[in-house]
From Swiss-Prot:
Signal sequence range: 1-22
Coiled-coil annotated residue ranges, if any: none
Protein location: Secreted
Native source organism of the sequence: Hoffmannihadrurus gertschi (Scorpion)
Protein name (database record): Venom protein HGE029
One cellular component (GO) term of this entry: extracellular region
TM segment ranges: none
Keywords linked to the UniProt accession: Secreted, Signal
Domain of life: Eukaryota
Tissue spec: Expressed by the venom gland.
Homology family: Belongs to the non-disulfide-bridged peptide (NDBP) superfamily. Long chain multifunctional peptide (group 2) family.
Amino acid sequence: MNAKAFLAIFMIALLITDRAEAGWWNAFKSIGKKLLKSKLAKDITKMAKQRAKEYVVKKLNGPPEEEVAAIDALMNSLDY
């Protein structure tokens, strides 16, 4: 059986069963919420936001002047 199909069947079975049998789902959600509010998760989120900002600035501003000079020199050498 395909792993994705098995996971889908498992999740549907959890939704159908009694609340008492699926009680671990609430524990899983509460642990997830605690992890998302942890210092490590906040640090990772902060780093990801910083990297995204740096990427956007890099793409919007274009290459640094040294790279432009190197590309110009390369293009001039190809012209003969």
